[in-house]
From Swiss-Prot:
GO terms for molecular function: N-acetyl-gamma-glutamyl-phosphate reductase activity; NAD binding. The lineage of its organism: Bacteria, Pseudomonadati, Pseudomonadota, Alphaproteobacteria, Caulobacterales. NCBIfam families: argC_other (TIGR01851). This is N-acetyl-gamma-glutamyl-phosphate reductase. It catalyses: N-acetyl-L-glutamate 5-semialdehyde + phosphate + NADP(+) = N-acetyl-L-glutamyl 5-phosphate + NADPH + H(+). The gene is argC. Transmembrane segments: none annotated. InterPro entries: AGPR_type-2 (IPR010136), NAD(P)-bd_dom_sf (IPR036291), NAGSA_dehydrogenase (IPR050085), Semialdehyde_DH_NAD-bd (IPR000534).
Length: 317
């Protein structure tokens, strides 16, 4: 334990930070260090913690994350940023290890790792394998429809649903948002999905805490070679073969389902993909199921931490 790498979570009191801490507490292969709560806003104290750690996980808003990065002068400190600030930035490894065969190595070799967004994790997981396989044309306009538990919106949205004194408190069971089609996750989806055309993203929130479904509907006739559902399924299976945290449901399992529960993978770092649709109708409905606070946030951060520090990738997961 004495020689175990030191890990500092900057923003450990937030929703994602708390879940990361829960996954790391008690591990003997690393040392979790914390700042005095009274000094969380003290730049000098934070800088000392950031530079004394072997790895830091930033669970902060974008601007605060950028400030934290600017405080790191130790060239050996690994930074894993959970904000959107660096997800499309040069010099940062994108922290979706299953993106392609080279991504895990890029994460392991990098000192700057950007943790993926929850919605993009599902969208990219469905899209990138099909683009790489030549099935989905990179220039094809695609749409992503998604629903998340309200924790996906951070403290503000949690208060909106749970705090009756909040100015924007709602009793709605479900609502759509991102109506201007300018959600901040779209550039990330496009870049790491391998798309040349900006996708349409239509998110929604339900009155439940966590759990997420991301969908990509497709007309088979718009794809290269007019593939069948089995062809699409085979491409996904091939891409994720051997991956511990990404599962592609069998076509038989998908066919037997009549509904899908967005809370189905809560508390895990798993991501499950489904191929629904109709060959006769020439349409596919691809679906990703995940915990927005698991594989969509804290779980992915711990997975990236393990990779970056050369530890067991599944530790704490």
């Amino acid at each position: 334990m004495a020689n175990a790498p030191k890990v500092f979570i900057d923003g450990e009191a937030g929703t994602t930070g708390l879940q990361i801490r829960e996954r790391l507490v008690g591990r003997t292969d690393l040392q979790l260090i914390s700042i005095d709560p009274d000094k969380r806003k003290d730049a000098d104290a934070r800088a000392e913690m950031l530079n004394s750690a072997d790895a830091v996980i930033l669970c902060l808003p974008d601007d605060a994350a950028k400030e934290a990065v600017s405080l790191v002068s130790n060239p050996n400190t690994v930074i894993i940023d959970a904000s959107t600030a660096y997800r499309t930035a040069e010099g940062w490894a994108y922290g979706f290890a299953e993106l392609d065969s080279e991504q895990r190595g890029k994460i392991a070799a990098s000192k700057r790792i950007s943790n993926p967004g929850c919605y993009p994790t599902g969208a990219i997981a469905l899209t990138r394998p099909l683009v790489s396989a030549g099935i989905l044309p990179a220039e094809l306009p695609v749409s992503y429809n998604a629903v998340s538990g309200y924790t996906g919106g951070g403290k503000a949205m949690i208060a909106q649903f749970e705090d009756e004194s909040a100015a924007d408190h709602t009793r709605a069971p479900y609502f759509i948002y991102g109506l201007s089609l300018s959600h901040k996750h779209v550039p990330e989806m496009q870049k790491h999905g391998g798309l040349l055309t900006r996708p349409i993203f239509t998110p929604a929130v339900g009155r439940y805490a966590q759990g997420m479904i991301v969908e990509m509907p497709l007309h088979l006739s718009t794809l290269n070679g007019a593939p069948s559902l089995a062809d699409i399924h085979a491409a996904l299976v091939k891409h994720y073969k051997g991956e511990a945290f990404v599962e592609v449901a069998s076509l038989d399992e998908a066919k037997a389902l009549t509904t899908l529960d967005p809370e189905g993978l809560n508390g895990t770092n798993r991501l499950k993909l489904f191929v629904f649709g109709s060959d006769a109708g020439g349409q596919a409905r691809l679906v990703a199921l995940l915990d927005n606070l698991g594989k969509g946030a804290s779980g992915a951060a711990v997975q990236n931490l393990n990779i970056a520090l050369g530890l067991d990738e599944a530790a704490g997961l």
